[in-house]
Amino acid sequence: MEAQTLYATGKRKTAIARTWMKPGSGKITVNGKDADAHFTTNAARIIMRESLKITETLESYDVDIRVIGGGITGQAGAARHGISKILAGLDPEMRQKLKANGFLTRDARVKERKKYGQRGARARYQFSKR
């Protein structure tokens, strides 16, 4: 009998992470390669593994993540969100830990749009009095 594979989707900024998890040795793959090869910055690696560390399941599950869009930080946040959603469904005690750390909340902060008549979202064109 094949081990049960769990699935969840995580989002952050413009990144979308489809996450599959099954009992295993703690191997994490992102887009077909090792997580440390995909996430080049140490901060992104830490963000991605945070939910597994807090619930003490880092060595208990194999995680496969397919992530599209966004940058490195957005992709790491999306991966963490997806992993957290799976772990929350497994055990109510884990859900409490994840919720207390804010890992189950979809981070709604996205880039503010550029407005017409302005240089950027908030920046104005230089004003000349005379």
From Swiss-Prot:
GO terms for cellular component: cytosolic small ribosomal subunit. Pfam families: Ribosomal_S9. Coiled coil: none annotated. GO terms for biological process: translation. GO terms for molecular function: RNA binding; structural constituent of ribosome. Keywords: Ribonucleoprotein, Ribosomal protein. SUPFAM superfamilies: Ribosomal protein S5 domain 2-like (SSF54211). Signal peptide: none annotated. Belongs to the universal ribosomal protein uS9 family. This is Small ribosomal subunit protein uS9. It comes from Desulfosudis oleivorans (strain DSM 6200 / JCM 39069 / Hxd3). The gene is rpsI.
